[in-house]
């Protein structure tokens, strides 16, 4: 890698149209996991593949599910409206109370289910992967959360503004926003910020870019290391001059269109599969979480400064087809040893991942904005893939 360079990543807020859709899709997944046990259905039997489209005064939800019959369209609609309200949409072109919601969910294909379900419940018959695909995990020691600095700080800027908006401190700012941070690296380490972009919806129509900068600049400075912003840092705040019409009214949203924001901001490869709206039999989601977990634990164990890890699966096949690790020249042991160590330390079948990371829970709506990675593990099992509890086992295995 070059010693000196610039790298840029972006983030978007929970009110971005695509993120509204991710949130809705994950709310449906959580609903099925919450209601399943009440109906006596095992969480292992829950299936959800939910896609959402949101546009002016309209939400369309489509996909395949398997779960309790007690989950009705009225219940789904109620959950969706509550999510839109929580995000903050009460504008003429998209209001949580009045937008039309169309629900087009149907049972999962039997052809897909036969390759995923255990053939003989209660036996050791393995569950296969829900689809073929490749998944990547990544970690680097350049931030405390072992995430790349550009995406780490792009998320942090918008999270701080969002917290202020929800608290009522920033009543003139709307839910829809984007950030972008260009980080200067020297000797492979982040040392400063060259460019800052924030585009933020405002609820007062005649606000100028200067007015918006007055509102958001304190949060940008709070998010970034103090000495990283200098007189050479270039600011772009609402560079088009006006951002009054926001959210799905201004730009149609779809589930799964922010996969780089969801992961590593472009600093690592991506297998192409989105996360939101999918239950953990879908290895697009669960194996990507496992890949991050393993890469993070390798770095946390001091076995490498950077780590990229790839897993590959085939539909209906339980074991991963391949495990690949690249420590980018920073490894303290060989990649071959690390590949063997991760296979010994964790069962990487779909059932093994779901068990190890405790994924059969309603923990997904919270992942739908500000990244699935670099988050703090929750007491109820949310963000379990961010734990570093495998580090000691990996050190012993090598």
UniProtKB/Swiss-Prot annotation:
GO molecular function: any one? ATP binding
A single BP term in Gene Ontology: S-adenosylmethionine biosynthetic process
Q: Which UniProt keywords apply?
A: ATP-binding, Cytoplasm, Magnesium, Metal-binding, Nucleotide-binding, One-carbon metabolism, Potassium, Transferase
Recorded name of the encoding gene = metK
The EC number of this protein is: 2.5.1.6
Q: Which SUPFAM superfamilies does the UniProt record give?
A: S-adenosylmethionine synthetase
What assembly does the database describe for this protein? Homotetramer; dimer of dimers.
- Top-level taxon of the source organism: Bacteria
Q: How is the cofactor bound?
A: Binds 2 divalent ions per subunit.
Official protein name in the record: S-adenosylmethionine synthase
Q: Where in the cell is it found?
A: Cytoplasm
The main place the protein resides is cytoplasm
